[in-house]
């Protein structure tokens, strides 16, 4: 997998994300692609849901919930860097206005815009087989006027 080919796949992924084409995003991923949104946690009464698992189960559910709660969700890609091993690093801002509850964050019509760092791996078949994302979850909560004390 050449660096330019891997970067092209990930660029298409973000284009589909911007278009809220969740099925299209998952179509760019292998059937067993790993998914890890490191800062993501939803605390419930009996368990904690974390953003770790597979794209087809955990990732797709998170992305679907996100675009539902933030109907104008968008991303601005600032840089995409890849290598011939299929590794691709993306710096992007994710932004949107909350209209529906997101986890335990009540909708107040607030907007957020937060820098994100993503690390992808694209396999030899041209499919994404790993997605990892990092961001400041507290920064998003502040922007959405959600102040939670543990």
Residue ranges, per PLM feature:
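C-terminal and inter-domain tail/linker signature
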Residues: 1-150
């Amino acid at each position: 997998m050449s660096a330019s080919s891997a970067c092209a796949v990930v660029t298409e992924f973000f284009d589909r994300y911007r278009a809220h084409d969740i099925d299209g995003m998952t179509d760019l991923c292998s059937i067993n692609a790993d998914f890890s949104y490191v800062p993501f946690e939803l605390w419930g009464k009996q368990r904690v849901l974390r953003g770790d698992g597979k794209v087809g189960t955990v990732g797709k559910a998170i992305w679907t919930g996100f675009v539902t709660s933030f109907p104008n969700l968008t991303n601005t890609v600032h840089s995409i860097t890849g290598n011939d091993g299929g590794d691709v690093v993306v710096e992007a801002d994710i932004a949107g206005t909350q209209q529906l509850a997101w986890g335990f964050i009540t909708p107040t019509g607030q907007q957020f815009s937060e820098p994100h760092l993503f690390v992808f791996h694209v396999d030899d078949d041209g499919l994404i087989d790993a997605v990892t994302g990092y961001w400041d979850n507290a920064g998003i909560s502040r922007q959405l006027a959600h102040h939670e004390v543990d």
